[in-house]
Amino acid sequence: MAAKDVKFGNEARIKMLRGVNVLADAVKVTLGPKGRNVVLDKSFGAPSITKDGVSVAREIELEDKFENMGAQMVKEVASKANDAAGDGTTTATLLAQSIVNEGLKAVAAGMNPMDLKRGIDKAVISAVEELKNLSVTCSDSKAITQVGTISANADEKVGSLIAEAMEKVGNDGVITVEEGTGLQDELEVVKGMQFDRGYLSPYFINKSETGIVELENPYILMADKKISNIREMLPILESVAKSGKPLLIISEDLEGEALATLVVNSMRGIVKVAAVKAPGFGDCRKAMLQDISILTNGTVISEELAMELEKSTLEDLGQAKRVVISKDTTTIIGGVGEKHAIQARINQIRQEIQDASSDYDKEKLNERLAKLAGGVAVLKVGAATEVEMKEKKARVEDALHATRAAVEEGVVAGGGVALVRVAGKLSNLRGQNEDQNVGIRVALRAMEAPLRQIVSNSGEEPSAVTNNVKDGKGNYGYNAATDEYGDMIDFGILDPTKVTRSALQYAGSVAGLMITTECMVTDLPKEDKSSDLGSAPAGGMGGMGGMM
């Protein structure tokens, strides 16, 4: 076991504080409409430029192991805030830095660290309740545009694109961000349910100019099994042929004579048919087939339920207004499923999302939810260079997370004003003893830090502006972009309540742990023995050369 380097008390806390300040100072320059860029060196390729707090935080590793521990703990604050709300990482880092700095001063002055932490926790819990009281619901397109614009660093085009996407696919719809091919940002909306499976044979194509399969008002056969024997399909094929409608087959796989016979029938015009593999794998495939069956009002032919393909009838088949199949995707538009059944399925998936433990499961469930609820929108980000593209894509993703958070929990006045108002309302909050009161004051003082930093980044005097804002009421605040005072809601400067709440909670949690740290342990650096080892073989080789 490697020897350890151990530091205690004030010596440990000073080292940790240095690390906290290095990371936070690098991150906080990005805050606000006049925040600066940070250039990140890469091991290969061009450096990347960002104004995203968590991207800066993730790049920072310090040489001194004790300082690095402090930096990594604040990095955890940024990451947790990012995971919870998708934004607010810079605010969270700044709050943590302020609480740690003020808290460690109090510890050095002889205060009890545990009581300080209790005071901080009490202030944070009360502040979260006050934030909920200040929160206003965010449902109209204008408010969503404003939130997206602020989070994308005042890029109005991005804000309006996100609002348009949410309007078209609904608040639960899937919105993905991709790198575009041109200079302009674009929005592409896919209505209906789309999944990543294309046609099994190019001979199914009936639109040769576009290379796709289009089926109008088709029947849809869903089977949770491999189909290789055409005989078991003959009864249903004959029924479909008599109806004169096309047929889409979605199965685990379709191969051998079954596929060959379908291709021949399709080319001869006997039955207009197309076949695709079912989306997903294992249990996920079963669930997605069930989703499709509910959307199209059909039944999944499953051997697990002792159902046989040859006994299936037209009543077992789903229906839709239109199906479009490309080489890679299948889109079902206008499924005839009953609304109450679809809504019940949506509610069931929402419950599964709440119960899911892994991020992967949540992601897949969210995709399924969106496909049932509304559709899929793709935001294609345009830029002149690759460096700009990456920076802009990160901003658009942040803005998207922020708008989702705003729809979920509402919005509060932005520009650091909400936290200043909360701190003002809690000025009479008291703990059980004086040390807890100091902890409360530390947390309330930290709530001014985001506003102070926004003002500082815009080149103004933080104390003067902060006092002016504190003298005002309600949503009165400072617009750093235009250098004027007024109602932040009227200015369109909004922050999602969830983002502000998450930033405060995670900052308070980690900062409280750091204040109560009394000992730090790390590995001693290993001695470099390479120079001694390097000289021995050289001498040996020389001796061998002499022998030869």
UniProtKB/Swiss-Prot annotation:
UniProt enzyme class: isomerase
Pfam families: Cpn60_TCP1
Residue numbers spanned by region Disordered: 526-548
Positions annotated to bind ATP: 30-33, 51, 87-91, 415, 479-481, 495
Molecular function terms from GO: ATP binding; ATP-dependent protein folding chaperone; isomerase activity; unfolded protein binding
InterPro entries hit by this protein: Chaperonin_Cpn60_CS (IPR018370), Cpn60/GroEL (IPR001844), Cpn60/GroEL/TCP-1 (IPR002423), GroEL-like_apical_dom_sf (IPR027409), GROEL-like_equatorial_sf (IPR027413), TCP-1-like_intermed_sf (IPR027410)
Top-level taxon in the UniProt lineage: Bacteria
Compartment(s) where it occurs, according to its Swiss-Prot or TrEMBL record: Cytoplasm
This enzyme's EC code(s): 5.6.1.7
Compositional bias per record (Gly residues), positions renumbered to this chain: 537-548
Keywords annotated in UniProt: ATP-binding, Chaperone, Cytoplasm, Isomerase, Nucleotide-binding
Main location (coarse class): cytoplasm
Catalytic activity: ATP + H2O + a folded polypeptide = ADP + phosphate + an unfolded polypeptide
An example Gene Ontology CC term for this record: cytoplasm
GO terms (BP aspect): protein refolding
UniProt family annotation: Belongs to the chaperonin (HSP60) family.
Subunit structure comment from the entry: Forms a cylinder of 14 subunits composed of two heptameric rings stacked back-to-back. Interacts with the co-chaperonin GroES.
Function (record text): Together with its co-chaperonin GroES, plays an essential role in assisting protein folding. The GroEL-GroES system forms a nano-cage that allows encapsulation of the non-native substrate proteins and provides a physical environment optimized to promote and accelerate protein folding.
Protein name, per record: Chaperonin GroEL
Organism: Buchnera aphidicola subsp. Pterocomma populeum
Gene behind the chain: groEL
